[in-house]
Amino acid sequence: MSKTKVNVTIDESGDVDRLLQTMPDVLQHKQLPKALRAGAKPIIRDAKQRVSQPGYPGDKPGKEPLKNTIHAVIRKYEYTSIAVVGCTWPDGNHGWLVEFGHDITRTKGGPVFGHVPPYPFMRPAIDATRSEVAGSVLLVLQMGVREFNSQ
C-alpha cells in the first residue's frame, strides 16, 4: 500500500458504534473484519471507476494498470480491526503521485521542470460512498448478530 495515509471515520448517527457496544467480544472479533471488507467494496468499485484508465500519459509500462492495484487489506489486532484501502505495492506504488500530483525533477532535490496536477480518485470515492459504506458495515454486523442469536 502507499505510504500516504487517509483516515476515514464513518458515523451514521452512531448506529455502528451502538451495535458494536452491544455485541460480545467474540462476535465482534469474528464479524468486524467481514463488515470492514463489505464496507471497503463500494470504495474500491468507485475508485476504480475514477482512476485514470490504462494507457494514460503517466502510465508505467510493464506494470499492472493502476486500476487493477486498488484493493483492501483487513488488519486484525487484539481489540480491533481496520481496513486499509489503496493501491498495492509494487505495481501501484505511484498511486499517491496520481492522487496528489507532484513536481517533475530530473534528480532528487534538483530544479523543478514542471508539475503534474493531481487527479484524485481515492478521496472522492470515499466521500461519494460514505453512506453506502456505513450501510454495508451495519448490514453485515446486524446479520452477524442475528446469526449469533439464532445459535
Sequence positions of predicted segments:
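Short, Lys/Arg-rich flexible segments
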Residues: 1-84, 90-91, 102-151
